[in-house]
Amino acid sequence: MEAVLSALPWVPVNISGSDLLAKAWFGDSQYRVLLTDLSTVWEEEMSTDDIQSRAQDLNKRLRAPAQAFFSHLCSVARPCFSGLDEDQISAAQAALEQHGESLTVKLKSELAGLPFYWEFRCTTTPVAVVCRQLVRPLLAMTLVLQRQAEDLAALLARKDAEIQDYQENGAVLSRARLQTEPFEVHQYKENFITQILPQMNVTLDSLGFDSELQALYMAVNSGKTGRKRKHSPDSSPAAQENHITDHQHISESTDVGPSLASQEHNNAKESGRSQVANSQQTLPLSSTAGSEDRSTSRAKKKKAVGLFR
């Protein structure tokens, strides 16, 4: 269960007006729920027998197998812990109560035309679980995002070098508004911290965890970024293969000039030998014909063409 729960992302939810991060797993006959307000982390784990006992205790008028109770509970509880809008969880009314170190989420719905009550009675989570489910993955995510920023900075540097090469060979922008200054990574970092970051109004109790961060959390926590990070386009296997291919193309294009020159030189030698051999086996041509052959030979010579004419 721990591994399955680790693969799930934290989702921002609002229960009875309180903002929380939730992580919930519902199996065939058991569940486990984690909730946090970034001050405390609560959890509850229940199995079949415990679910049957609590369902009978909270719903005296209902008599049903444990599987029927659990199936209905899943249908009304999953939306509550998935961050959906209130209109989408109208099948159940949710209430939140905190007593000391305990947190209770109360749900009220209908089953077979009768009220169905359920309570998630969560207690504080051990520190080891908090580290496994929250602290370690978030630290790993910061490393991944830092590497992603470094890759983007390196890409911008290569783009600047490419633009400079175009400019040195006479390329001119058609629209002046598109012109940009060369990217300087240290200056950008300083400006981001001193100018942009204060405008973001980021607080330490922010519960923002959007879909992109959820996807990154799942990738990091499932071990997909162990030796080869797959969520950065520049470091993906396809991108690495393309980078190697591009490097080979650059190397091949760099050696094209000498190779063509050497090939033309060898061809000229071969042509010269062939002409000498033919002249020994045939009658001498007139001076006019010789002049025409020489002019034709000069016309057939190739002229080297570079990237810029």
UniProtKB/Swiss-Prot annotation:
Residues 243-252 have a biased composition (Basic and acidic residues). Residues 1-134 are annotated as: Globular head. Keywords: Chromosome, DNA damage, DNA repair, DNA-binding, Nucleus. One of its GO terms (biological process) is telomere maintenance. A motif (XLM) lies at residues 299-309. One of its GO terms (molecular function) is DNA end binding. GO terms for cellular component: DNA ligase IV complex; nonhomologous end joining complex; site of double-strand break. This is Non-homologous end-joining factor 1. It comes from Danio rerio. The lineage of its organism: Eukaryota, Metazoa, Chordata, Craniata, Vertebrata.
